[in-house]
Structures are given as C-alpha cells and as structure tokens.
Amino acid sequence: IYKALVRVGNLAYLSGHGPCLDGVTYRTGRVGLDLTLEEGQQAAREVGLSLLATMKRELGSLDRVNRLIKTLALVNCTDDFTQQPLVVNGFSNLFAEVFGPDHGVGARSALASNTFPGNIPVEIEIILELKD
C-alpha cells in the first residue's frame, strides 16, 4: 500500500516507477544479460515518461514543477555490469529536455541490483520542488 506522489510543503516525493504506463510494462530483463546498454537507456527514458504521467495526473499540470531535486535510480543488471550511470542518462536526458538543463537536472544516484519486481530493468524515484 503506497501513494505514487506525496506532497510535503513545496516538495513532491514520487515513489519508485518502472517502465510501465496504465499497468502495461514496456520492457523487462536485466541489463548486461537480456538488454544492451542502449535498451537499458530506453527503459530509463520509459520510466521518465511514466513519472511524467504520474506528475501530470497528481499535480494537474507539469507547469507546477519548479525543478528536479534528487533522483534515485536502481538498475537491474548482472554483477559485472558497471555502467549504471549511463543507463540512467536515458531518464536524465528526458527530464533535461522537458524542464531544461537547470531545472531538469538535479542530484542523482545510480545503483545496481540484481532482482526487481516483475523483472523490470530500471526503477526510479524522484524528489521535486513545486512552484508556490
């Protein structure tokens, strides 16, 4: 049981999202085994699209967002895969396109894991600053 987005003052905390929209998973698999680096980047971009859809639904408009503060990204990958930051660039590039290089880029962590619910390749949670 959880909420997709929780507001505290002018901050919005978004729960972890996968490359899913309307209950449909776009992509599954582990990067470095089932997916290439490029496919992992596309999966991270798809996670970004899912987050944008949640933001629009919960906030009413993306215009309510002032900036991205923090991204925590987890990449489902093999033990020897070490390019998690490059995978997560698929997400980061999308948010930079949507919100600009100043407001769409924040602090970021890109970590590895080797198992995810539904075998999704990437899960991302974010913290946003909202406009007054």
Briefly describe each language-model feature range:
Residues 1-132:
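Short, polar/acidic, helix-capping and beta-turn segments at strand->helix junctions
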